[in-house]
A protein has these predicted regions:
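C-terminal binding/interaction regions
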Residues: 1-17, 66-130
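Glycine/charged-rich beta-loop-alpha catalytic/anionic-binding loops adjacent to active sites
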Residues: 32-43, 67-71
Length: 130
């Protein structure tokens, strides 16, 4: 888990959040054990920005991976920063319900871990479209 947290911290340092000043880093482990990180990228046209989890997923997909097996997320200060609803659904596309999502302080101290099912109960996923 420490490698995920370190990657999320490094990604957070690159976040582009000039409007909200809320800097987020996320890192995800894929099915091969590789770590993919992302940061939030705000835009003056607010809804057009990217969440950190979204940019980490993009990195994971571009590498050829198809599964998320573990996640770390950290935001500002000591505030619990969980993925937003949209990112929970995006993670769901690539992860099983028992995947752990570790929420940390900006300096990497673990605050709480959740399963994806805890954050997104009774979710809709790819199997619903078969």
């Amino acid at each position: 888990m420490q490698d995920l947290i370190k990657a999320a911290m490094a990604a957070r340092a690159k976040a582009h959040a000039p409007y909200s000043k809320f800097y987020v880093g996320a890192a995800m482990r894929d099915e091969h054990g590789q770590v993919h990180a992302g940061c939030n990228i705000e835009n003056a046209a607010y809804p057009q920005g990217w969440c950190a989890e979204c940019s980490a997923i993009a990195h994971l997909v571009m590498s050829g991976a198809t599964r998320v097996t573990e996640v770390a997320v950290l935001g500002n200060g000591d505030v619990l920063c969980t993925p937003c609803g949209g990112c929970r659904q995006k993670i769901r596309e690539f992860a099983a319900g028992d995947v752990k999502i570790h929420c940390c302080t900006e300096v990497g101290v673990l605050l709480k871990s959740f399963t994806l099912d805890e954050l997104l109960p009774a979710s809709f996923g790819p199997e619903n479209l078969k």
